[in-house]
Amino acid sequence: MNNLLDDIKNNYLFYGFYQRYRAKGRLRSIKRNKKKIPPYLLKDNFEQELNYKLWSTKGARFEASTRNLIQKKLSAQSVGFLSAYLIVINIVHIYNLSFWKLNITANDVAFASTAFSILILLYSQLESAEDHGVKAEKFHSCALEIGELYNKLRLSKSQETDEEKRKRIREISNEYDLVLRKYDNHKSYDREKFILNKYHYHGLNFFERFFGQAKYYFLVKFKYHLLIWAPLILFVGLNILKIYEVIK
């Protein structure tokens, strides 16, 4: 009987400790989530909300324009590198040269040349369809238009009465909706890049910034760098393996 009472007592103490631990965990979670709430939502103020929307959307559209310019540049570079690799392969075939330690047959060279030709053709078509140059220009124009609305809203804070300000806010909000309908939306990682650039305002720590930048790199730049450097890395890697086999 005493053992049963002791077990009940211990279980009760353990359960009480567990409940207190969960309560503290919920409290910490609430505090963390409260810190992540955007400042403009902490107060029920439509003017502040519109101000943040204009500011953040303008920044995201500028980031989208910059991203498309970067992709346009990297796309041209990757096509150039792939074309250079194709020329080198054909030169090796014509002059009967060797690939360092690799013994490449004529059939291997012909296959590699054909594969690179198909890859360049397909990749060029896909990148041409993206039309990064035109998108960059449109996103830039959109950001400028939203920037004008943002400046109007900022000026209305100090130069108008409350009634005039409310009327101006409604007008700016309607104009903002019209601007959004005119242009394509930016990608989610464009807004994330804007938030990363304004990390002090959004309260991001080092790890959030690091993983955010890494995610942006893999989504925007990685595929181009892979096309540029993968053939060269593959060539060097195969030669290193060949040298290792010779030494062994």
Role assignments for model-derived ranges:
Residues 2-79, 128, 132-224:
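Conserved non-transmembrane functional hotspots
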Residues 69-134, 211-248:
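Alpha-helical transmembrane segments and their immediate juxtamembrane boundary regions
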